[in-house]
């Protein structure tokens, strides 16, 4: 059994956490995030820490408390430091450029792909083959990165495609005659 829920989340300086019934709001230097807390979890804010206690008798309460603790910790880190995800384009002619709030991708198709960025996500292209996504919501950053990677996932024979910066692509050997 995981003990994630037993560890409290500390609130760093410059971050304000408010609880209104089952709605938790976290505000910081980078922005603010709001989340509705599950009814199986009681949240207590005291002495600069947030504690998560499962409701007695609720089914799966410890699991929900652990999940809630992890999500709230990501909210606190996001509004204080922010999150970033790097993508790499590997392949001849694969390019990315920023056009306003959209990313224009050339990935070997007969047409360029335009990926619209949702509110709360900013992108940067330090080079033609690199994309850096930044924001306060970890889930949203990961979702946008997965959508961009989904246009052309790395293939196992040559390794071409869109990959995460820290991703290891498992390579296969070509068939021999």
Swiss-Prot record:
One of its GO terms (molecular function) is rRNA binding. GO terms for biological process: cytoplasmic translation. Keywords: Ribonucleoprotein, Ribosomal protein, RNA-binding, rRNA-binding. It comes from the Bacteria. Pfam families: Ribosomal_L6. The keyword Nucleus does not apply. Residues 152-177 are annotated as: Disordered. The keyword rRNA-binding applies. One of its GO terms (cellular component) is cytosolic large ribosomal subunit. Residues 152-171 have a biased composition (Basic and acidic residues). Part of the 50S ribosomal subunit. PANTHER family: 60S/50S RIBOSOMAL PROTEIN L6/L9, LARGE RIBOSOMAL SUBUNIT PROTEIN UL6M. Belongs to the universal ribosomal protein uL6 family. This protein binds to the 23S rRNA, and is important in its secondary structure. It is located near the subunit interface in the base of the L7/L12 stalk, and near the tRNA binding site of the peptidyltransferase center. This is Large ribosomal subunit protein uL6. It comes from Shewanella oneidensis (strain ATCC 700550 / JCM 31522 / CIP 106686 / LMG 19005 / NCIMB 14063 / MR-1). The lineage of its organism: Bacteria, Pseudomonadati, Pseudomonadota, Gammaproteobacteria, Alteromonadales. The gene is rplF.
């Amino acid at each position: 059994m995981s003990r994630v829920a037993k560890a409290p989340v500390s609130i760093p300086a410059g971050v304000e956490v408010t609880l209104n019934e089952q709605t938790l709001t976290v505000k910081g230097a980078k922005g603010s995030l709001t989340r509705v807390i599950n009814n199986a979890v009681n949240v207590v804010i005291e002495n600069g820490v947030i504690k998560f206690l499962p409701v007695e008798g609720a089914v799966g309460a410890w699991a929900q408390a652990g999940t809630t603790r992890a999500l709230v910790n990501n909210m606190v880190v996001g509004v204080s430091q922010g999150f970033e995800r790097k993508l790499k384009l590997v392949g001849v002619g694969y390019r990315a450029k920023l056009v306003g709030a959209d990313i224009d991708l050339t990935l070997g198709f007969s047409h360029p792909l335009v990926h619209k960025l949702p509110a709360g996500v900013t992108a940067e292209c330090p080079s033609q083959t690199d994309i850096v996504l930044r924001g306060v919501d970890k889930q949203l950053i990961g979702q946008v990165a997965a959508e961009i990677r989904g246009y052309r996932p790395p293939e196992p024979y040559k390794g071409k495609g869109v990959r995460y910066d820290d991703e290891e692509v498992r390579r296969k050997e070509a068939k021999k005659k």
